[in-house]
Structures are given as C-alpha cells and as structure tokens.
C-alpha cells in the first residue's frame, strides 16, 4: 500500500462549489495538502450524483501515470459503490467523508489501498437540533423544518431530531438542496399557501445554515411583519458563517460540524506512506452553538 513517490496525489470530490461548509472543506484540505506535500485536485459535482460519478470514473479510467493515490469524496447521493470498486481495483485509495457505507469492509479486505470513512455523527446532529427546539420553545410551538435532499445525511439528521424533539413542538416539513436559494424557494413556496399564512409559526429550523438564511430572507421579503418574532436555526456552525450569524442575531442557534476533509487526507497519507490501514470509520463530534444550556427561549409575547 505504500507509495514510492515523494509527492502523493489526491482528488477531493465535493458536492457544490458555493456552500459555506463545502468551501471550508476545500480550504482545510488544500492547507493540509500543502503541509503534507500532496498534490490535491478539488472537484465539484454541482449537486449531481451522476456528475460526481462521471468525474471520478474519468480519472480512474485515465492513463495510469495520471491517476491519484487516493480519492476523497463527500457523496451527493449514494456512496457510489461501483466507483469505489473501480478505484480500489486500480489501487487508488477511497475515503468517504460524512458518510459510511456497507461496502467498506469488503473493499478493505480486497484492497491494498486505504479504504475508510471520516464522518460527523449525523444522527447526533439531529438529536442536538431536537434539544435546541426544546430550549427555544419550552412551552411548545410550531416550526417549519427544512430538510436537505433525500440522502442519508439528511435522513439521519431527521431521525435524530425526531428522537429528541418535544411532543409539544409541531413541524411542517420542507425540502431544500443545501443552498441558500433552495431554502428561500422552499420557504417562499410555503408562504404562498393559505395554511402557512394563517399558521402561528415560531420559526424555521434547517439542516444547514445556508438554508436557514434563505428561509429568513423569504420571511423578510414576503412576511416582514413576522420575521422579528421568529427564531431561525441551522447546522454547520462555521466561524465566519453560522457562528457569526448567531452572534449578530440572524440565527438563534447552529451546530458546529467539524470539517472532515483534512482528517481524511491526513489519515490517507499516513496509510500510504506506512503501509497501514486506518480504522474503518473515524467519527468526529458536533456540538451546539451556543451550548444548549445557554440558549434563550423565544418570547412568545412578541408575536403580532
């Protein structure tokens, strides 16, 4: 599994090029690559699983001398089992970010290249959101809940949230695509429905900070009389985005979700240079920002 080359080559495949968390994944990976003397190519799949698959297969099936030593990817849809198999057959390492897959044990047994996953605990992220709801709405209430696309991460976050959400908090489910615009569009469509116009809503929880911001913008533009009496919350919690938005009052809470790309790259490089196989799954911990105990309840009397 070890490489004889002084400089290793890696490919990082990310979901979109305009998301705060995805941009931070690229930034930290490029910084880590520089320190590790790794040539890193970053690809973006434009939120399209077919594009992601085609981009990676094109590299795998290209000239041997141009192939990377390892591929790291945050899957758009499925964890691309056929691409993973093709990569490991070509002796290319395979690292899943923020996802685990049933095929990992089999590929690890058959491959001489490193095969593993580095992931945030997606269910725990959801559980934290449920606790934030309880802190913000101790007497219950009604929220719009903006889920991401129908992929595992979004599903697990929803499952975790439902496990800790208070029974007296009701949800109306909406669907976005992780982008601010998709959060705006989903919320704006809902606000055009009479059922939403007439509803007593206390806020919007979204599965990432950008969708939460998009939802807030929709209320500012379409229901400005309601926005100041509502709470908005998301996930990612980057210092320059979610955390900053909590500090300036645009969000009531977020969840700090550590980046995983630099960890995956570091573990892969160590594996390639030492001939060892990392643990099958490395999990990093998320946390509420601010801490759940410090979240101030929404003042219901503020409703107009």
Predicted regions and their residues:
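Short, low-complexity disordered leader/linker segments with a strong preference
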Residues: 1-9, 64, 87-90, 304
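Extracytoplasmic "Venus flytrap"
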Residues: 4-28, 32, 41-57, 75-78, ...
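Hinge/cleft segment of the Venus flytrap/periplasmic-binding protein
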Residues: 6, 164-165, 256-304
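Hydrophobic alpha-helical
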Residues: 70, 74-92, 176-244
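Flexible loop/hinge segments that line or gate small-molecule binding clefts
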Residues: 83-124, 239-247
């Amino acid at each position: 599994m070890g490489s004889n080359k002084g400089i290793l080559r890696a490919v990082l495949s990310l979901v979109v090029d305009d998301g705060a968390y995805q941009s931070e994944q690229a930034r930290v990976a490029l910084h880590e690559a520089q320190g590790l003397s790794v040539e890193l190519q970053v690809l973006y799949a434009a939120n399209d699983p077919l594009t992601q698959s085609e981009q990676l297969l094109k590299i795998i099936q290209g000239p041997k001398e141009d192939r990377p030593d390892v591929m790291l990817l945050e899957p758009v849809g499925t964890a691309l089992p056929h691409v993973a198999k093709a990569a490991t057959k070509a002796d290319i390492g395979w690292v899943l970010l923020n996802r685990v897959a049933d095929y990992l044990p089999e590929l690890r047994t058959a491959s001489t290249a490193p095969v593993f996953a580095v992931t945030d605990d997606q269910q725990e992220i959801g559980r934290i959101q449920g606790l934030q709801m309880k802190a913000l709405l101790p007497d219950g209430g009604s929220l719009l809940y903006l889920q991401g696309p129908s992929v595992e991460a979004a599903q697990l976050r929803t499952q975790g949230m439902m496990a800790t959400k208070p029974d007296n908090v009701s949800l109306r489910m909406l669907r976005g695509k992780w982008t601010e615009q998709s959060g705006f569009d989903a919320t704006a469509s809902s606000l055009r429905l009479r059922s939403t116009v007439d509803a007593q809503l206390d806020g919007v929880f979204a599965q990432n900070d950008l969708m939460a911001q998009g939802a807030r913008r929709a209320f500012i533009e379409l229901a400005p009389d309601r926005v100041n009496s509502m709470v908005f919350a998301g996930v990612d919690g980057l210092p320059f985005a979610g955390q900053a938005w909590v500090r300036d009052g645009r969000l009531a809470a977020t969840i700090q979700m550590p980046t995983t790309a630099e960890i995956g790259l570091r573990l892969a490089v160590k594996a390639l240079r030492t001939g060892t196989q990392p643990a099958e799954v490395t999990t990093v911990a998320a946390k509420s920002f601010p801490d759940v105990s410090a979240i101030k309840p929404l003042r219901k009397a503020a409703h107009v």
